[in-house]
Amino acid sequence: MVLVACGTRPQQPAAHPDWSYNSVVYEMNVRQYTPEGTLAEAARHLPRLQEMGVDVVWLMPVYPIGVKERKGTLGSYYAISDYEAVNPEFGTLEDFDRFLAEAHRLGLRVILDWVANHTSPDARWIEERPADWYVRDSLGNTIVQYDWTDIAKLDYGNADMRAAMAAAMRFWLNRGIDGFRCDMACEVPIDFWQQTLPALRKEYPGIYLLAEGEAPALHDGAFDASYAWELHHLLNDIAQGRKSAADLRAYVARDAAAMPREAFRLMFTSNHDEN
């Protein structure tokens, strides 16, 4: 479960949706949320989440997973083969639409995990789009980052790829979602976010945009909120006696000095990277 704790509203109001102030965000892993691992079954639990006080459901990636270089038998949600489809393991687009409709009926918001840095090595884009949509080595092979051997990094020097990424985001916004949690946001050039996100806000007023990242620049005309990673680890250290309230005071002052006043900070108890 994740908490978004935001302080007082800025004197010059930012373009944050009213519903996002002090909202409680619940991260949902569809595969593991119910024994069936489907959107249809997960939707049955939405009333319970509402009763718990959840405001926003953040769905981990629901898109098809690549097969090539797949890690394990099920693969990683973050090795996406098609940005505009639902993983058949979870159901269909119609199941997704019903999940979204039920959430909205209950007054809940739904944001999707968005992986803009890379796709799977056998993604539809690799098969159908020009080679220069991807970063390649001297031999023409797509490249991986870190130990992510199941991905291919996208090339943000390509204007057509950027436009297609924005169009894929619109695909889901047209279905009625309430925003995105953008995976590894700092790995994507900031100018892409600064160009794309304001345009999406104009077309879809009231959307909420969360960055997995902690760089102040993410708030420069781009995201509503960013991760408070440092605070999460600091609070764990305080709970275990390794740090003190003085360290917390120092963090609050340091973060306030570094971040724009209107920036929302995602203060979380846990997430899929930490649990």
Predicted regions: what is each one?
Residues R9-V25, R31-A40, R44-D55, P61-R175, ...:
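Substrate-binding/active-site clefts of carbohydrate-active enzymes
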Residues D18, Q50, L173-N174, R254-R261, ...:
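Acidic (Asp/Glu)-rich catalytic clusters
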Residues E27, V56-P61, F180-D183, L210-E212, ...:
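Short beta-strand segments
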Residues V30, Y156, W229-L231, S270-N271:
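Active-site donor-binding loop signature of nucleotide-sugar glycosyltransferases
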Residues R31-Y33, P64-I65, A116-N117, D178, ...:
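Short, solvent-exposed loop/turn segments at secondary-structure junctions
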Residues L100, A167, D178, D183-R265:
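Active-site-proximal helices and loops of the catalytic beta/alpha 8
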